[in-house]
Amino acid sequence: MHHLWKIPRLFTLWGNEISCRTFHMNIKKLIPIQWGHQEAPAKFNFASDVIDHWASVEKAGKRSSGPALWWMNGSGKEIKWSFRELSEASKQTANVLSGACGLHRGDRVAVVLPRIPEWWLMILGCMRTGLVFMPGTIQMRSSDILYRLQASKARAIVAGDEVAQEVDAVAPDCSFLKIKLLVSENSREGWLNFKALLKEASTIHQCVETESRESAAIYFTSGTSGPPKMAEHSHCSLGIKAKMDAASWTGLSTSDIIWTISDTAWIMNILGAFLEPWVLGACIFVHLLPKFDSQTVLKVLSSYPINTLVGAPIIYRMLLQQDLSSYKFPHLHSCFSGGETLLPETLENWKAKTGLEIREIYGQTETGLICRVSRTMKVKPGYLGTAFAHYDVQVIDEQGNVLPPGKEGDIAIRVKPIWPIGMFSGYVDNPKKTQDNIRGDFWLMGDRGIKDPEGYFHFIGRSDDIINSSGYRIGPSEVENALMEHPAVSETAVISSPDPSRGEVVKAFVVLAPEFLSHDRDQLTKVLQEHVKSVTAPYKYPRKVEFVLDLPKTVTGKIERAKLRAKEWKTSGRA
């Protein structure tokens, strides 16, 4: 598929003078090419054009003395790296990958590591050598790893003790896999030891001059149906888009510290804990957090000079379960949330107990961030904010026509005739799947929504999750939001359920809070139904309620409504 590319307001991206707030390309080594009607660099590499730039700024004494990466493990160990130290260590990593590992430009490398400093080194090392990194979660089991290695034809995998045994169980079935690189203090048969090799590696490395549109990363999307798809991103769609986005939502300066709590396999991690802070010269804070612990997070926020917090809504909900009056956050001034629906109740409670707003960010693996509520924008409960300037985001109908404000439709990004910077390159080996997601001139986000007169987008629900009952279209998140306001509900998922008279009715799967487990279920069902009727339009109330111990989720924590829905309709004989 051929697409035209654009970078609006190119002059804002680079110039001739060093500034502590703006990264600048080395113009002499970049050859402008025409993408549509805009100029863009023919070559771009985040490691050399951003990290090495800030290392030079530090050397010139024009950046504050704060770290670029501040890591801790909760057991007293802390690591602080400046951009100069980060630059040198990532060059050593690049030498390990191209030297001892014998990997070549374009080879694909699975990186399955927890939140340890080596993850950041490995991604930068891959960038420097022109390798394609593929992040994966340490929650994967052998079957997950096997699928990813086989589908991607990965030449190498980088992993720790957490998954090494799982890798060894499937490696013989992966004919393309040649290198297993272990990040551990221990040794393991058949594996190279990264830490040992790093100590001996040179700090001198010539960064590969990667093409802007050259493949940089592959993310396996956590779809709720079918095998994961391989979403491919270029050096341009990751790095240059980060520069275009960062200042317009985080507002970070070189003296700021941002903490993004995310699994290393998620797109949010590379955006909020790698690309976007570093293009602005800010510090990234990382806590190992092998298991999420609300008290640990609150203590860190109270004790460390963290200015900006980014996390999924569930993180804020879990923090709110603690007594926040015992904590003070003297440095925290900005909170952002993305990845799932932010309940108005969560936003209101957080504001009441901390005095801070939670601002939504919205996007997907394929697009990166497309909407946000920036620090200078007003917060509207239930709204995702407005589109970034370089994305034309609209609500469209089933024919691909743009709908006026206030009309419900599919949230989509215009990709024709200009395929915008930041959009992924496509699904690897699956151009049909890429094309199937385009309606008219627009890329479908897979979400239903409404755009208001001010340009704010209101999320209604996933396109395939919408419930149509007696002619009423009901978004599951609206019902879930209502249920979550009741103290009996710890977690919930709402789907459609077959009904002989209405076609479909709303059904809620509910995980009860511990203190309500002994309550009469029939009575509790009635209480919850009446509660929903009291806080939202009565036609939305769940006519069916099923109490469960847990909900099916993907490895990245998303509730699999599709799995619940398939089981529900199959049981009825109407699947």
From Swiss-Prot:
GO function terms (MF aspect):
ATP binding; benzoate-CoA ligase activity; decanoate-CoA ligase activity; metal ion binding
A biological process (GO) of this protein is: fatty acid metabolic process
> What range is the organelle transit peptide?
1-46
Please list the residues that bind ATP. Answer: 221-229, 360-365, 447, 462, 558
Q: Which reaction does it catalyse?
A: a medium-chain fatty acid + ATP + CoA = a medium-chain fatty acyl-CoA + AMP + diphosphate; benzoate + ATP + CoA = benzoyl-CoA + AMP + diphosphate; hexanoate + ATP + CoA = hexanoyl-CoA + AMP + diphosphate; butanoate + ATP + CoA = butanoyl-CoA + AMP + diphosphate
Name what cofactor the protein needs.
Mg(2+); Mn(2+)
Query: For CoA, which residues are the binding ones?
Result: 139, 470-472, 502, 533, 541-543
Q: What is its EC number?
A: 6.2.1.2, 6.2.1.25
Any Gene Ontology CC annotation: mitochondrion
Spell out the subcellular localization from the entry.
Mitochondrion
Q: Where does substrate bind?
A: 365, 473
Gene3D superfamilies, per this entry? 3.30.300.30, N-terminal domain of ligase-like
Pfam families named in the record:
AMP-binding, AMP-binding_C
Record note on quaternary structure:
Monomer.
Q: Indicate the family of this protein.
A: Belongs to the ATP-dependent AMP-binding enzyme family.
PANTHER family in the cross-refs: ACYL-COENZYME A SYNTHETASE, ACYL-COENZYME A SYNTHETASE ACSM2B, MITOCHONDRIAL
**What does the function comment of this entry state?**
Catalyzes the activation of fatty acids by CoA to produce an acyl-CoA, the first step in fatty acid metabolism. Capable of activating medium-chain fatty acids (e.g. butyric (C4) to decanoic (C10) acids), and certain carboxylate-containing xenobiotics, e.g. benzoate.
Q: What is this protein called?
A: Acyl-coenzyme A synthetase ACSM2, mitochondrial
The organism of origin for this protein: Mus musculus (Mouse)
